[in-house]
Amino acid sequence: MKKITILGDIMVEPPFMQQVENNGEYDFKPSFAPLKTILEESDYVIGNLETPLAGPESGYTHELVSFNSPDVLVEALVDIGIDAVSTANNHSLDRGYEGLVRTVEVLDRYGIAHTGTYPEDFDGERIHYFTVGDTKFALIAGTFNTNFGINRVDLVGKRARCVNMLHPVHSGGAIYLPLPPAFAKTLAYVEGLMGRKLVWEESTKLKRVMDMPRCSIDDIIPMESFERCWQWVCEDYAEARKNADVVLFYPHSGGQFNIEPGKYTQYMVKRAVELGFDGVFAGHAHTTQRAEYLEGKPCFYSLGNVSMSPGTFYSIPECLPEYGLAVHLHTEKQKIQKVTFSIFKMVQEEGVPMKVVPVDDLYATLEGEEKQLLQAHVSEVYTRVTGKPHTWENPQKEYDL
């Protein structure tokens, strides 16, 4: 059988960017290289590129919620065997329309296929097709958000279809769980002292100081706008079904740092399965969530991160955001015959750049309490994904869904 592997969110936050920089040069390869032991047996690898490649003149990442990575990031992705990426996510427009265009140009130059975002004059194939063995695949990707509230980049006129939107550009798509009255009172007091509203980064730091971080949840389902945006999904699916044996949906949607999928993402996944997709692989929550078979189709509500900086102040450690999934589709005779997954961890050691390490490889290097803690975390992630208690003695390279 052939093996298709799907990864989650590939990000470069400010801490990671600083770690891989040396005298103005950047080297991401050592950070991603350990993943090769998971990916070397894969025949095709897909990931979510959650950063523009807008060039140095646009300013590399220095803010937590506005990304731009050096082109050499793509060299590292090629090095570990990534064949295709989705560019449709909430950071697609962090450097505006021009950054979107340059991103796909850089990917073309390095030979990585892409889908989800397009220049305004694009007249090619919006669906990504690829063939592995005797099976032809179609990959359709989209995003529920492009951070309009932060970057204020709109998509109108000829640019209305430059991003595969699953929710209107101007909408949020997630709401925060209610905060305790004590925080609201403190926030009002601090803003009164400063004479202005706190920006997102400041209010997030205040939550952390008060030890009350909160996950977000996408429980709002605005049916009218959903149906309007869903129309392109239906059209692309119909086209893909005519031309491919296996059609995969790769949406960017969910509540950040929430270990449970929200109603919006659950509804969208259900609609995708009803439409006929052969598998759904979502991301954006920055933590792993459950997976299940719906009508016999594998559905992962969040694959988690590939390269989120451990310890980022706005993350919620309790949800284990430093662990991510690599989902493997074993295919033969034009069908998905089996689904497995691997677990890896983003490891940060003092004085060296973050590394992304498969948990079985990492386990072999640890001793004592560190070994026990890793095993406990892997067990928690496994149970969260499968709904089953673990039955293995040590962390494994792959697990059956």
Predicted features and spans:
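Acidic, metal/ion-coordinating pockets
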Residues: M1-L401
